[in-house]
Amino acid sequence: MKRWNGWGDDSIDFALGDDALAFLAERIGPGLPNVDASHASACAQLPPSRLPPHRLVQLAPEVRLANALGQSLPDWLRLRHGRIASVPDGVAFPDSGAQVRDLLDYAVACGALVIVCGGATSVAGHLTVPAGERPVLSINMTRMRAMLNLDTEAQLATFQAGVFGPDLEAQLRAHGYTLGHFPQSFEYSTLGGWVVTRSSGQQSLRYGRIEQLFAGGRVETPAGRLDLPTFPASAAGTDLREMVLGSEGRLGVLTEATVRITRLPHFETFNAVFFPNWEAAAAATRAIAQGRLALSMLRLSNALETTTMLTLAGHKKLVGTLETYLRWRGCADGKCMLMIGASGEQAGAKAALRSALVLARRRGGVHVGRKMGDKWKQNRFRNVYLRNTAWQHGYAIDTVETAVDWPGVTPMMHAIERAATAALGEDGEQVHAYTHLSHLYAQGASVYSTFVYRLAGSYEGDLA
């Protein structure tokens, strides 16, 4: 069952061992666990619905609460502290475009605002219900999850927009195909959500960002239906798909999406390379990205993230053996880890990996093989569960991401981390901040920073 006030399935945990907790305590102090609000108390505070009856609209408090917030830290704090400011007045679960059309007509008739909900994994406040006199209807798309068409000749697949990542991949893999879009929220986010938030997957180097994968679709708007036909390319005017990409539900409800698919790779490998310092690691990573090699992923962790991830992983003896070897090879306290992924035909993928390793070794890179890469792939959708466990031990975790050209990557990383650590300095609190480059381009990179700090014991203190 999905957690009502945290991330993911409540049967899955990311355990933190004694060494990991000691590491956090040394960095920022012992955690201060919070007493969370109960689900019953959160539901009890919800106001009555202002919507008139409709056969598709559910008004139960637990349903309204489940569709009220996403996964940003402010959303978490509202749920954990029981400070639910506002929720939708009702939630509908359509199973067809016709039902979405019916719901939009209903919303217009009763003057309701509409918020479109998929997996509720947004960290940007997309699901926040505005205060005001108008009622709010949430349209939850997750019952619209069928594959409607598979065109193997054009390598296009059309899905209802509410399909979750694992369901989408399972339907494609049954025919030997993949979309290849794997954001960290993959297990609980939807195709429609990816499109309207301009999502990027972990293996975007091979498969492309969602704007490269989105070929067309269908949108229901209050004024009528908008069909976006598929074209391999066009030189005729504005690309109407750009109206939908990143629109975050403001234009209308994306009910169908046609995406560009790829044959399942015959071969896939993820390999870890360590560098003695950030300067060498960033230079090597830039050289690999600008070499335009046929890789599927590059992910570079700075020194503090590398240390943090190795510590939180447990397996103290194995990590100790690795670090002894790396020190012997010249990668000591400031070491940074680069994860390299290669997917496709075996010969081509192996050739791309070899070329990347040549560039890495020129800058002092130490290749440690596939074992860490296999472990990363196994846990890549599990690491986000750390937020739940950290909270239980009295710590909050938040993230921020931006993208800059290569000359600005390192200055941006340092500026973000300095700002984060200074944020609570006036209160005498420490912040554990670390960064990785999550999406790499010839022009620049996405800078993804994580902050860990102790809970303050109050909603206002934790939010500050």
Q: Where are each of the predicted segments found?
A:
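General structural feature for long, well-ordered alpha-helical segments within catalytic domains
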Residues: L16-L24, P47-P53, W76, R80, ...
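C-terminal substrate-recognition/cap domain of FAD-linked oxidoreductases
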Residues: L56-R78, A282-A464
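Residue-level signal for inorganic ion chemistry
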Residues: S96, A107, G224, I340, ...
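N-terminal flexible segment immediately upstream of the FAD-binding catalytic core
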Residues: M1-D105, V123-Q155, T307, L312, ...
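FAD-binding subdomain of flavoenzyme oxidoreductases
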Residues: R145-S301
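Short, well-ordered beta-strand elements within core beta-sheets of diverse protein domains
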Residues: G90-D95, F270-P276, I340-A342, V400-T402
